[in-house]
Structure formats: C-alpha cells, structure tokens
Amino acid sequence: MGTLYICPTPIGNLDDVSQRLIDVLNNVDLIYCEDTRRAKKLLNHFGIETGIESYFIGNEVNKIEDIKRHLENNLNLALISDAGTPLISDPGNKLVEIIIKEGFRVESIPGPSSVLVALTLSGFDISNFQFLGFIPKSGKEKSEFLTKLLNAQMPSVCFTSPKRVIKDLDYFEKNGLNSQITVCRELTKKFETIHRGDIKEVIEKLSSDNLKGEITLVIAPSELNTNVNFEVDSALKILLDNGVPKRDLAKAVSLITDIPTNEIYDKIKDF
C-alpha cells in the first residue's frame, strides 16, 4: 500500500523549500497539484522530473478514486497546492478525510504557511487563534463572518484579495468591529509589506499602498469584547466566591451562551 504525502510549497521565497520536500517530490511516483502550470515552474526550478496531474475542486470526485487505486497498487503520491500548505483554504480536505478513513497511510511534510507567518508578525498574543479562511464576498455569509469576528476571544486569521481588502475592512468598521489589525501582503517576497494599527488607521494606510499580491489579515479581538470579557470574568468570580458550585455555574452559563458546559467549566475551574 502506498503513501500520500501532503507537501507545502513556498508562499513567495523559493529558498524556503526544505531538502526533505525536494527528496519526497523526487521520489514519489506522481504529484497531484492545484495548477499544473505553476507546479511545473516549481519542479523545473529544482530539477524535479516526477509526473504531475491536476487536482482541484472541479475534478475532485474522479481524482479521489484514481488516487485510491494508485495507493492500492503501492504507488507513493504527493499533493501540493499553488502556495503554502495544502488543505488550508486549498483543495484536499475531502481527499485526506477519505484516505485516512479507508486505512491508507498519510504523511505531512512541515513547511510554509501564510497563516503562521502572519500570526508571528502580528504582534498579538497568539497562544490561541482561529482561522476563518477567505472573507465571503457578500450577503448572509459575510454577515455571519463578521459575527465571528465580533465574538472572537482570540486573534482571527483570514484571507482576502487586493481588490477587496479595503472594502472588506470598511464593511467591518462600519458594522461595529473595533480591533487592532495586521495586514500582510506579499509575505516572504521582495516587496513584503506589513500594515499594523486600528481598523481606521489600516484602511488609510492601504488607501495609499499599491495593492497587489496575496493578502493575509490578522484581526485582534474587539476592544469592546475584551472589556466585556473582563467584566464577565469578574462576575463569575464573585458568584463562585459566594458559594455557587462551579458545575452549576458552568451549566447556567452554557444555557445562556450555547457554549458547551465542559468549555465553561475549564474556564472557571481555576478561578
């Protein structure tokens, strides 16, 4: 039985390719890629002659069956995306889920990720964070996305395009988001640009920037949210100090917030 290797590719700087990645791509029997043209440029740069096939959302169902058959025939395969780590807002989630459930071997090669690079450049406390993918273009999905940001207790990472980033941030600001934001453009490339500040400041900075390339946003929890959380924590501590059992308090808060009881209990058990 063969192995499927999850292989991250550079997000901008070819020097970020590891020797292990080169060895894997040289030695597998076939490489599945999001865009064959971009994959060829990468492989040619490193002198890798392994064959390639496309794998994207449009052909996913048929390709999964092909991949399963190849693995059953003891072929080793690699999955790469256009840039960064596959499955992170890229094709491959369904494939890996099925492959694992059916007992095939999967290995993940560590490597570049714009999500992690942006987080480490944000200047925020990133001991916890949430990744929200691409900002929806409009409608109910965008409203629900904003709600996640407004309710966030930790930094949020998301993607948008250069054409939409100012419009997206303007929408968030006009609908109540009061946060510090880090905007990362062209990460690891020659013209990497980082803008930091509150949402209004960042919009002003972007208005005078030559917006091209990939955009990764890191959005801190809303300042209003932070103040409210402090007040809620204080109230919980007062109730506990006055003899309310932790389990009972966790159940009551869970009923109000829809947050699972065990998560509430974990939060208050050390108060």
Please provide the spans of the model-predicted regions:
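Short active-site oxyanion
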Residues: L25-I31, G103-V106, M154-S156
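A contiguous loop/helix-start segment that scaffolds small-molecule binding in enzyme catalytic cores
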Residues: L75-N76, P155, P162-F271
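Class I SAM-dependent methyltransferase SAM-binding "motif I" and its flanking Rossmann-like core
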Residues: K94-A152
